[in-house]
Amino acid sequence: MPIADSQVFIALFLALATGIFAVRLGVALYK
C-alpha cells in the first residue's frame, strides 16, 4: 500500500517542526 502524498507532507512538516523546536530548546538551555 503506497503512502499518500499528504501523509508524506505531514511527516516532513512534523520532522521539520520537531527539528526547529529541538534547536530552539538547545539554544535556550545553552544560554
From Swiss-Prot:
Q: Which GO terms describe its biological process?
A: photosynthesis
**Keyword annotations from UniProtKB, A to Z:** Chloroplast, Membrane, Photosynthesis, Photosystem I, Plastid, Thylakoid, Transmembrane, Transmembrane helix
Classification via SUPFAM superfamilies: Subunit XII of photosystem I reaction centre, PsaM
Per the record, its GO cellular-component terms are:
chloroplast thylakoid membrane; photosystem I
Coarsely, its chief localization is plastid
Where does the UniProt annotation locate this protein?
Plastid, Chloroplast thylakoid membrane
Q: Which domain of life is it from?
A: Eukaryota
HAMAP family on file: PSI_PsaM
Which family is annotated? Belongs to the PsaM family.
Output the NCBIfam families linked to this UniProt entry.
PS_I_psaM
The protein depicted here goes by the name Photosystem I reaction center subunit XII
What taxonomic lineage is listed for the species of origin? Answer: Eukaryota, Viridiplantae, Chlorophyta, core chlorophytes, Trebouxiophyceae
